[in-house]
Amino acid sequence: MSLLTLKNRRERGFFDGQFLIAMPGMEDRNFARTVIYICAHSDAGAMGFVINRPQSLTFTDVLLHLDMIKQEDSIVLPKRAREFPIQTGGPVESGRGFVLHSDDYSSDSSIPVSDDICLTATLDIVRAISKGDGPTRATMLLGYSSWAAGQLESEVVNNGWLTCPANEELIFDRSLDDKYERALAGMGVTAAMLSAEAGHA
């Protein structure tokens, strides 16, 4: 599923607004120990973002790459901009940036993905954040995760993923190292429990 499909969708799918939490046996290195926020799901497929993978680039690096600032300007960026988090959202279009954010910021290109969360993928929001403005809560993700028609359903049925309602606090929490464990804890399980169950299946 693409961003265009997300923008043109009319109905929410079953996995919309859900977390996918990778089972301990996930072999795909792109998704091992990941928590994914599903933004769109329909008969055409699904699209979402990994929310617990760090990215080596900083927001300053992004601004420099986009020629929005010069190197000497980086030291005068607002503190909020200097510390703005960048994460790896998935293996599809990994050079493209997307901003998941609270709905207190909106532009013509912003796409509502839930009652409280929007997705914007244009330079307007990058400029706003660079000035210390923009949404109250946000994170930039490079790349996204995508599934073809029926693919996600098949992976869930085959015990590739656990699913649960998404938690906004966890989406925007900047502590990534233990986010996987906290997502599991929210379901009342641990990775060790799941590994033991798989071993006795």
Swiss-Prot record:
**In this UniProt entry, which cysteines form S-S bonds?**
none
Q: Which domain of life is it from?
A: Bacteria
This protein's GO cellular component annotations are: cytosol
InterPro entries the record matches: AlgH-like
What the entry lists under PANTHER family is as follows: UNCHARACTERIZED PROTEIN YQGE, UPF0301 PROTEIN YQGE
Name the protein family.
Belongs to the UPF0301 (AlgH) family.
Would you tell me the protein name for this molecule?
Answer: UPF0301 protein RL1035
